Amino acid sequence: MILIFGGTTEGRIAIQTLEEAGKTFYYSTKGDEQDVLLHNGIRLQGAMDAIEIETFCAQHHIKLLIDAAHPFATQLHETLEQVSVESNIPVIRFERIFPKRDEEHITWCRDYDDAIEKIQKEKIFILLALTCVQTIGKLKPLWQNACCYFRILDRDSSRKLAREQGFSEKNLYYYTPGEDEQVLMKQLHPEAILLKESGISGGFCEKVEAARQLGIRIFAICRPKTSGKFICVNGEHGLRRIVEKHLPDFFPLRSGLTTGTCAAAAAVAATWDVFNIYFKKRPTEFPVVLPNGETIQVPVEPQHHIPHSDLLENGDGMFETSATVIKDAGDDPDITNGMKVVANIAIPFRIDDPLPEDTPQDDYNIIVCGGEGVGVITMPGLGLELGSSAINDTPREMIKKNVKLWLERLHIAKQPNPILITISIPGGEEIAKRTFNPRLGIEGGISIIGTSGIVKPFSSEAFINSIRKSMEVAKATQSPRIVISSGAKSERFIKAYYPDLPTQAFVHYGNFIGETLKIAAEEQVPHVTLGVMMGKAVKLAEGNLDTHSKKVTMNKEFIQDLARQTGCSEETLAAIGQMNLARELWDIIPEELLEKFGKALIELCHRHCAPLLPNGELTILLITENGKIYS
């Protein structure tokens, strides 16, 4: 059993993550003002001290604690550390993602006392504190001797707490969700603002940018240090992976890593190796920042290649080494599971090269390419140049970003010499023969195409069960509409189309469109929107309700017939016959016929899907690669 301490955005994410398991857990908040939806979770309210938490854990067989409270909830953090030590229960600290500290534009303060001292020293008379109502008492020396305004949440408990701390209500202003941060600053004209280092989800970046644009000084209190006894994560994927590690039976299937994430980890390890001038022992795992911004730890294989340099007679040389990660796809039946993902780093140099400080650069020159076992693009339509490595933009940028972050962490100066990262998959060429890659024009190896960095475990039964759980949660929100889409990419576009719907109202169907609609019908969902991209739409329009490539492939003749009916020329029909991927249709169909073709495609999809939702209203949206929506 798991007990979450929340009350924050991170608490909500923790709920959503654990709900995927379909098992009971507990969610505790100090007050009752956070509105959260729990389907499998049980809500607890009211503060608990260490003894009360220990007693609860013993009575309810709690094996794992999740601290998803605010970064500045120091009393709770300390209490959970005490409980962890005395009860031998691990604590996962769900941290926020924090931007790099801006030393140029922000005056950083160690704590509240340091903030008071620095603000008073600067003789700031008009101050806007965006530090929450609980800090009013801590900052009393400031508002006793200057004009201070506090922005707080618009609720009775906050007003009561402000009064109890002796603060004048006329200097209180209330947070309005969605309001531009500049509005209040323009109204009050403060000389400075005071912030807490509350992270990206706490709106820290928006507050800083608003103040900078208005020329207002910025003071920020550094977040408290996290206990070294906690296991730290800062996102949903990392949280799930740690839960899977400590409670292997909690989730029905174990998540895994994409090839791109493995490649990024190997590239980071190789970067560490090549600059390890003091020959320290290499860590057993390295951090990788995923496309969603969170960081996870990825195990790497023991070091077998010592960095070396080769020098030719003409003065050209090369620093070079490599590192390996064994791909772990979790419980997903991934054909590449268990394969080696190797990253080689090579940095060319000349003996007479100028020093980096003599040739300052704006950024590192990092080049990513494929080696042994990584396919080469031989046909158009995949969004990559002919002859280039089959590494999509997302994993390519993830590799570059993580290498860059590690170079900065090692204080390596930016220099004009390129840093070449070559990704190899030994055995990839043979494995690729058992995939659709050759048919798509990817020759000589596998493709690295992941978009999230994480492999969600897939089996028909387990995935359909997860759809059912998600649908039950979505219905419980009482959302006026439930939106189903294939995955993260299409969901991102369709969320912008329905900005007011709760997060839980969006359900992933993967490839199981038919099963998802049947579940929606069983749950008596009145309004369903189906978001679909071209690749699945052309299969669905033909009546294939399971769109997995192993079950059904794109029927070019069917698409040509549809295109002919919508007025496309013989030249266009011939181009359709030569395409490799359905998404090429966005470029093949003439722009003036796209809407007509899209409507015809949607109509066919609706004809096959509507009978599965006999008592509900079905809306189908066709989504382009760039997020444009046809209805």
Report residues per predicted region.
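Glycine/small-residue-rich loop that forms an oxyanion/phosphate-binding "nest" at active or ligand-binding sites
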Residues: L64-A115
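Glycine-rich, highly charged phosphate/nucleotide-binding loops
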Residues: G41-C57, L172-D180
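N-terminal beta-loop-helix "entrance" segment that forms/cooperates
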Residues: Y26-M48, E103-I106, R159-Q165, T295-V300
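A C-terminal functional module that forms or caps the active site or interfaces directly
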Residues: R163-L214, F219-R223
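Anionic-ligand binding region
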Residues: A129-Y173
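A structural signal for small-residue-enriched, beta-sheet-centric alpha/beta enzyme cores
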Residues: R254-L257, L440, I446, T451-K599, ...
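Generic N-terminal targeting/processing segments that precede catalytic cores or assembly contacts
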Residues: F250-I412, N417-R434, P438
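Short, polar loop motifs at secondary-structure junctions
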Residues: Y27-D35, F94-P99, V133-I136, L153-S157, ...
